[in-house]
Amino acid sequence: MLKWDEEYLRLCKKILNEGKEVENRTINNTIKIPSYNFNLDVSKEFPILTVKKLFSRQAFLELLWIYQVGSNDVNWLQDRRVSIWDEWKIDLDGYWNAKQKVLNPDGSHEIKEIHKYFGKEYAGTIGEAYGYIVNKYKGVDRVLDIIKNHPKARDNVMSLWYNCHLDKGVLRPCVWSHEVDITNGTLNMYVHQRSCDVPLGLPFNVTQFAALMHLYARVGGYKVGTLSWSIKDAHIYVNQVEKIKELIERGKTLSIYEGYKNRTWLEGQLQNYKEEYDKILKTLTKEELINLKKGIVPDVLKSTDLKVKVCDYVLNPPSPELWVNPDVKDFYKFNNDDECKDIKVLNYKDLGKINFPVSE
C-alpha cells in the first residue's frame, strides 16, 4: 500500500472514530474533526490513491483550468468530458439553483430551493471564484516569476481568498492558498484547505497539487520535495459513511494479503479467484454486465472482484510516477486539450471505483 493510501485511510478512521456530527449549509450533515495535517514526500512517491480509482485526467484538467487557463467557464471543462463543476454552473438566466439548508428566525433549519442571481454575464460559469481570481490578480504569474528569479524568497504565496469576491462566486474556495518554498534546489509546497470533503475532494486535490509541484519545478529546473497539507474542518457527509467503511475494509483486506510472503500461494489464490470470477460473470444479467463495463461491480461479484484485484496488487505492486513532457518548460504551454497529453500517471493500479454522493 502506498504512503498516501495509509495517510488517507488514517484520516478516514480518525473522522469516524473521533468526529462530531454537525449541520452545514447542505442537505446532509457531516461528521467532522476541526483540523488535520500531513506531509508527503513527493520525491519518493507520486501521491495518487490506489485503494480506490482516481481519474487523473479529470484531476489534471481541473488543475489546468484554474491555474493555467485562469477560467471560471464550466463549458471549458464540459468540452473536455469533465463534469466536476456541472452542479455549480450558473444558468443562462443568470441564476444558480440548488437545495440548501436555510436558518429560520427561530433558529431552526429548513431545506429550501435556492435561486441566487449572479447576472447573465456569468452564465455558464461559477462566478467570481477559482480561475477567475487567478486571472484577475495574475497570481500564478507572480509565483512563476519568484520561482525563476527570486527562489530564496519567503513570500511566494498564491491565494484565492479575496473578501470582495466571496459572495460573487457560487462556491468559496476550499483549497484557498498554496505556498512555494525552494531550499537547496528542491521545491516544496504548503497547501491550506479551509473545508475538506474527504471522500470526494481530498484525493483529487492532493494529486492535483503534487502535479502542480512538478510543473512549477519544471519551470525552474528544480527537484520536487515535500507536500505539506493543512486542513481546517475535515469531514465526511453522513450519506458517504457506508462507502467510506467499505473503503476502509478494502484497506484492511489489502494489508492482510500484503502480509503473506509466499508468492506461489498468492499466485494460486489469484488463479482460484479468477476462476470464481468467471463463473459468477456467466450468471450476470445484461444490465449488470453493462454496469460492470462502467466500473460498477454488482454485489454478487464484489467480494471476488476485490480479491482478484488485491492478489494482483500484492504480486505486482503499483509504483505510480508522474510523467511530464520533457520538451515543455513553459507553464502556459502544457497541453490542456481533452487528452491532457503532457501530464500522465504511469504504473498506476487501483482496487476499483467507489461512487460517493455529492452534497451541494
Regions found by a protein language model. Name each.
Residues 1-360:
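Terminal, non-catalytic protein-protein interaction segments that mediate quaternary/complex assembly
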